[in-house]
Regions:
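Well-ordered beta-strand positions in beta-sheet-rich domains
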Residues: 20-22, 51, 67, 88-90, ...
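Intrinsic-disorder/low-complexity, polar/charged segments enriched in Ser/Thr/Lys/Arg/Asp/Glu/Gln
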Residues: 16-22, 29, 65, 78, ...
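Short, intrinsically disordered, mixed-charge
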Residues: 34-47, 75, 121-128, 132
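Generic structural detector for well-ordered beta-strands
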Residues: 22-26, 61, 69, 92-94
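Beta-strand/loop substructures that line and gate deep hydrophobic ligand-binding cavities in soluble
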Residues: 78-134
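Short, ordered beta-strand-loop transition motifs
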Residues: 10-15, 53-56, 72-74, 95-98
């Protein structure tokens, strides 16, 4: 099984933008979770992480996006981070029929800071990492 990114969608309501992606990863959910829910894991495909307290209400710090909070946390299922300049990023994992993992991603933010192509590039990196077994 190889990973894939299904067509993303974008909505705009005033100055609020919402991006959605469905990413299929060729690894079991238990091995994908650390890539989304640990500082080391996020560094491997998303970018640097100053701090991440892996729990509801925990602190997260992302260079360039600022400090924030873990606003949803369900181990091996949901990690959601809300940061000062980056808005709300939600990672929702599900088992898929092929033995891999389906990642449903939502990013809600203000302004023009993020783009669909930028997230697609990040998810391509995440897929490569998963395919290597990292």
């Amino acid at each position: 099984m190889t990973g894939s990114i299904e067509q993303g969608s974008s909505q705009t309501h005033g100055n609020t933008h919402i991006l959605h992606f469905l990413v299929r990863l060729p690894r079991p959910l238990e091995t994908v979770w650390p890539a989304l829910a640990t500082a080391d894991g996020l560094c491997g495909w998303f970018g640097a992480v100053d701090v991440l307290e892996p729990r509801l209400g925990g602190v997260i710090g992302l260079p360039g996006l600022g400090a924030g909070q873990v606003t949803a946390w369900d181990v091996e299922r949901v990690a959601e981070y809300t940061v000062e300049s980056g808005g709300r990023m939600r990672f929702h994992l599900e088992h898929d029929d092929a033995g891999g993992t389906a990642l449903r991603f939502t990013h809600e933010f203000q302004g023009e800071g993020e783009t669909e192509s930028r997230w697609r590039a990040r998810f391509e990196q995440l897929i490569r990492q998963a395919e290597r077994g990292a």
